[in-house]
C-alpha cells in the first residue's frame, strides 16, 4: 500500500487498482500539494470522512457530486445526499462497510463534529481501513483514550495520528497512544497547517521511536510504502 500525505488530515491510500481518499481538505488547505482540479481527476473508489469540521469534510461534496461514494456517519451521509452527493453511505460507530476495495469500520473519537454551516455532524469518528491485507487506523481528531487498546487489539499495520495540540492531542500524548495501538508504522497529521497547530512532528517521532514504532514524518505530497 502507498499512503500519500496531502496535508492536515488528508491522505490518498493506493493498493493495486484501488484508491481511497480520507478527509479531503484540498481547496483552501495551505499545505495541499495538489489542486482540487487535479484531485478530482483521480480514480477514487470512495471518500471517507472522519467528522464534519471543514478541515476534514473539505471537498467531499465535489467528489460526491461527481459520483464518488462518500462514507461517514449517518449524519454525514444524510447531509451529503441532501446536498447533491450521488452515492452517500451513512454508518455509525462499530459498523463496517464492505466493498470490492476492502472495508472501513467506524471507531469512537474524542472531539466534536459540525459542518461549516453549523449543521450537527453526528459523533466524531476514527476509521479502520482494510485494503489487501493492510490495516490502517486514521484517528480523525481525538485525544488519547483508554479504549484505543481495543482498536490496537485488531492488529494495526499503520496509525495516522493527530499531533497538532489545541484542538487535538499534542505530540507527547499522541506518542502515548502507541502503547495502546501498537502499530508497526505511525504517521503524524493535523499539525502546522494553521499557526495554532503547534505540535512538533519531530517530538512525536522521537517519542514514538523510543517506544519501538517505525515513525515516518511525511511532508505534504510525500508517500510512505507499507
Curated annotation (Swiss-Prot):
Keyword Phosphoprotein included in the entry's annotation: no
InterPro entries in the record: Metallo-B-lactamas, RibonucZ/Hydroxyglut_hydro, UPF0173, UPF0173_UPF0282_UlaG_hydrolase
Keywords (A to Z) from UniProt: Hydrolase
GO molecular function, one term: hydrolase activity
PANTHER family: UPF0173 METAL-DEPENDENT HYDROLASE MJ1163, UPF0173 METAL-DEPENDENT HYDROLASE MJ1163-RELATED
Protein family (similarity comment): Belongs to the UPF0173 family.
Name of the protein in its database record: UPF0173 metal-dependent hydrolase Dgeo_0136
Native organism: Deinococcus geothermalis (strain DSM 11300 / CIP 105573 / AG-3a)
